[in-house]
């Protein structure tokens, strides 16, 4: 079996990630990466945060490399509709233009639904 390439989309902003790291010893995306690697150790995992324009640009330019995309949970609220939340929604909308399989968890599902 060939390697699987997965893109994990972090659902927390840096401040919320710090709280998560204190509680769980890793970010939401890192914890999810560890689970994926336990299930399939040969998986290549890339983690991005949609608030980082350079990361999203690179991910979208290389979308054909990924077998799947996972949108993690997070602590943000769609009703707040901050600039960062809008970037998450825009990134998800752009992901739907490609044929990748998508798994969206909690916050990630809200973002994908809004996209």
Which residues does each PLM region occupy?
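N-terminal beta1-alpha1 cap of cysteine-dependent amidohydrolase-like domains
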Residues: 1-90, 94-98
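Catalytic nucleophile loop
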Residues: 96-115
